[in-house]
Structures are given as structure tokens and as C-alpha cells.
């Protein structure tokens, strides 16, 4: 005879979520994960992701376990076989494909053999044009995918990333004790067109007008050298870049954020921070679902033509409210 605990486990089903992508992509699915969790109560939720997000997603309250996809080339048959074995082991009854890529489409068709698969291609309603669908913002597309998969969408449009934060008081107190503005003046090395070139000029204006505010940044490992050229405090933890959870805690503790269109900008938006993100021609704030009631975007055709004074005019009222 089965005891209660054994019965409970016997009745549970395993659910798989797939999400690779950039830091901003991971941040944005917080509401999606929460909605899936609330729909799949009583079932065990796994997420398949890349190794750099394992520590982060291991603390996410909406998933139970994290699986690693090394995303090796598809001609690496030994790796594909190993991945197939890993997935088969858990006998997943449902997949939510949040990556919606050619790679995950390949997994669905040739590798995982799981019939109940939610992706944009499998859930798009008859008569809906894919090109029109793709004009929606990132979060709107997720909302449609979830609704067409019988998931109640209460949180998808308003992701809350606060679960990622850890306390960073000991780190920050080594640098200063007053309120601070956080800047993110860099971007991925491959996306330098996203970088606004006048952060030092903006810093000079802010320090002149608001001497009560400190200005800080948190460079990633490949930004530490470039950060020496910026007139702001570089926050590290024992001379190492902050991890994602520490960075989330630092953003949460800040009074205002100014950023290029990067992962930390998405973190700031979905941690409920006041801030401004700067956009050039590469995309629109609506397309990437970054604006909130507090976190706003300033878009221009060419970031090189956006002056420091223009940016300051957009944020000065908010800075004046910081005691």
C-alpha cells in the first residue's frame, strides 16, 4: 500500500520549460514562470537553460529543478544523444518552449518526442499571420502563447525579478554610505552600437547639480578595464565582478538607474526601479517590453547625437526627489 508521500509523488507530473538567451531574456520570463507555476500546482517544473543561469534559476521560487543545455552544434551526435537521454529520464508530459528558436524546434521534431509542446508555432491560432504576430512585444507574444496553452496570465506582462536579489549591504558599505545612482555604460562586445558615448559628461553634470548623490557602476569581467575610463565608483566583490544575484541586490538598493539597452536595464525595469534606458536605431522599447510606470526609455536615431544635457533634462526631476 502506498503511503501519502509516495502517492503524492506518484500523482505528480514533470513539466519542462526551455529558455536559453541573454540575461535580459531570462529576467523577462519571471512573470511567465510565475503563471506556469500557478497553473501547474502539484506538478514538478524543470527548466532547461545554459550553464551561466544555473545558480540564478536554482533560487527561482517558480521552478523546482534546473537542467543544463550546453547548446553544442547539432552535428555533435554524441551530445544530442546524451541530451535526449537526460530528457527521456524525466518522462515530461508537457513542454513550454519559451525560446521559440530553430534549435528548440529541432528538439521538438527530432529529439525529445514529447507531444504536448507549447511554442509560438504550435499555439498560433488558425488564421493568425506569423508576421503580424511577431510585431507584438516580447511579453505580449508570451501572453498569447500561454493563453493558447490554457495558462492564466496574471503576471506575464508585469515580471517581478525581486526573487533574484540578495543583500549587498556589506559590499556597498565598503564604498559609500549615501544614496547612489547606478549607471550601466557598456553593452555586449558584439553590440557596441547600443553604447551611448557621453556618460562622463552626464556624471559631471549630476555631480555638479546633486553633490549629495554618489554615482556607481558594476562592471562585468570584460568591462573592468574600460570601467577605469568612467568617472564613477566601480563596485566589485573582492575585486571580482558581482554575480547576477548580487547585481540584482545592488540595483534594488540604488535610487535611480541610467543604462544602455542591456541585461541590467531589464533587471532594473523588473525590479521596480526608477530609471532611464537609452535606445538608438537597433530596436524599440515597446518591442523588447522594457518600459514600466517607473522605468522609461529615451529613443533617438543616433546615440552619438544625444547630448548629456538632453539626458539630464529627462532625469533631473527624479534626481531632485532623492533625499
Each predicted region: which residue ranges?
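Catalytic machinery of carbohydrate-active enzymes
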Residues: 1-323
Amino acid at each position: 500500500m502506498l503511503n501519502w508521500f509516495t502517492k503524492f509523488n506518484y500523482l505528480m507530473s514533470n513539466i519542462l520549460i526551455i529558455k536559453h538567451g541573454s540575461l535580459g531574456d531570462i529576467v523577462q520570463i519571471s512573470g511567465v514562470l510565475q503563471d506556469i507555476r500557478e497553473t501547474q500546482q502539484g506538478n514538478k517544473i524543470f527548466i532547461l537553460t545554459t550553464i551561466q543561469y544555473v545558480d540564478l534559476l536554482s533560487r527561482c521560487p517558480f521552478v523546482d529543478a534546473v537542467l543544463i543545455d550546453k547548446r553544442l552544434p547539432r552535428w555533435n551526435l554524441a551530445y544530442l544523444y546524451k541530451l535526449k537521454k537526460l530528457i527521456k529520464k524525466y518522462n515530461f508530459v508537457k513542454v513550454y518552449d519559451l525560446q521559440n528558436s530553430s534549435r528548440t524546434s529541432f528538439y521538438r521534431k527530432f529529439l525529445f518526442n514529447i507531444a504536448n509542446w507549447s511554442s509560438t508555432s504550435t499555439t498560433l491560432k488558425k488564421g493568425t499571420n506569423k508576421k503580424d504576430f511577431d510585431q507584438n512585444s516580447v511579453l505580449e507574444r508570451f501572453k498569447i502563447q500561454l493563453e493558447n496553452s490554457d495558462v492564466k496570465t496574471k503576471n506575464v506582462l508585469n515580471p517581478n525579478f525581486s526573487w533574484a536579489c540578495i543583500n549587498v549591504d556589506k559590499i556597498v558599505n565598503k564604498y559609500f554610505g549615501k544614496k547612489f545612482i547606478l549607471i550601466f555604460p557598456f553593452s555586449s562586445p558584439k553590440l557596441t552600437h547600443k553604447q551611448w558615448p557621453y556618460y562622463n559628461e552626464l556624471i559631471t553634470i549630476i555631480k555638479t547639480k546633486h553633490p549629495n548623490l554618489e554615482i556607481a557602476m558594476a562592471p562585468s569581467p570584460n568591462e573592468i578595464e574600460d570601467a577605469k575610463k568612467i568617472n564613477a565608483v566601480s563596485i566589485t566583490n573582492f575585486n571580482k565582478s558581482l554575480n547576477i544575484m548580487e547585481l540584482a541586490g545592488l540595483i534594488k538598493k540604488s535610487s535611480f538607474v541610467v543604462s544602455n539597452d542591456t541585461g541590467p536595464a531589464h533587471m532594473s525595469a523588473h525590479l521596480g526601479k526608477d530609471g532611464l534606458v537609452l535606445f538608438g536605431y537597433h530596436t524599440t522599447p515597446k518591442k523588447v517590453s522594457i518600459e514600466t510606470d517607473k522605468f522609461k526609455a529615451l529613443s533617438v536615431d543616433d546615440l552619438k547625437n544625444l547630448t548629456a544635457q538632453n539626458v539630464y533634462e529627462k532625469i533631473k526631476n527624479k534626481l531632485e526627489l532623492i533625499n
